[in-house]
Amino acid sequence: MSHIGVAFDKARAEGRAVLVGCMPAGFPTVEGSIAAMTAMVEAGVDVIEVEIPYSDPVMDGPVIQRASDIALAGGVRVADTLRIIEAVAATGVPVVTMTYWNPVEQYGVDAFARDLAAAGGTGLITPDLIPDEAQEWLAASDAHGLDRTFLVAPSSTDTRLEMTVEHCRGFVYATALMGVTGARTQASAAAPVLVSRVRGVTDLPVGVGLGTGTGAQASTVAGFADGVIVGSALIRCLLDAPSLPAGLTALRALSAELAAGVRTPAH
């Protein structure tokens, strides 16, 4: 079983959901992002999702875009991302990477898979890659023992959903809201329906992303999903802070609140 699968199994045995916290690599700096992700782990985040900053992040909301722009302006490269992954993986939590496909193609698909595995990464979430066009990635992830997470949405047809899920390993990423990511005031009513559709075709855990920003929302999502994925709300802790130390304090507090939320699922 994959490292991330173990995290989901452990959470299930404890009657709770997994908390996945996302942060772009190199935001606010390379060392700053390592400090931020380490703080999240110390506050109770179960899995870290490291996003590779990209200049045209079509599915990311304004908060993640702004953080990615800061990282890119600082000159962050894929090699830096791998160093960050290695540092965070050393804490013992699973580290999954989210990336648009272009940076992987530019790096070389097999070389990227090899280097990601060597850094201790567990796998990839690929928002703009569909299994039908992923032959090279399917082969590379098999060769290097990496998980692969494709996205399903409320708009996915049954055929598309089944085919997508069939090619996932580790967990399935269910996007709870249509459109770009970002903290919302309420969880999408479509999310529980989507999760039950996914569970109808696979035993893989289902993580729900897009919109969670408070402990209460995390508790709600934990009531119907195996994983609660949070990005924008955590990133905003750093964006809105006057300094990195102040940002890390806010980040720890929100991470702890979210961690408490996933441990008290609302049924």
Swiss-Prot record:
Pfam family of the protein (one): Trp_syntA
EC number, UniProt record: 4.2.1.20
Pathway: Amino-acid biosynthesis; L-tryptophan biosynthesis; L-tryptophan from chorismate: step 5/5
CDD domains linked to this entry: Tryptophan_synthase_alpha
GO terms of molecular function: tryptophan synthase activity
One GO cellular component term: cytosol
Entry keyword set: Amino-acid biosynthesis, Aromatic amino acid biosynthesis, Lyase, Tryptophan biosynthesis
Reactions it catalyzes: (1S,2R)-1-C-(indol-3-yl)glycerol 3-phosphate + L-serine = D-glyceraldehyde 3-phosphate + L-tryptophan + H2O
Active site residues of this protein: E49, D60
Enzyme class: lyase
Highest taxon of source: Bacteria
InterPro entries to which the protein is assigned, alphabetical: Aldolase_TIM, RibuloseP-bd_barrel, Trp_synthase_suA
Gene3D superfamilies linked: Aldolase class I
Family under the similarity heading: Belongs to the TrpA family.
Known role: The alpha subunit is responsible for the aldol cleavage of indoleglycerol phosphate to indole and glyceraldehyde 3-phosphate.
NCBIfam families with a match to the protein in the record: trpA
Subunit (UniProt): Tetramer of two alpha and two beta chains.
Protein name: Tryptophan synthase alpha chain
Organism: Salinispora arenicola (strain CNS-205)
Gene name of the encoded protein: trpA
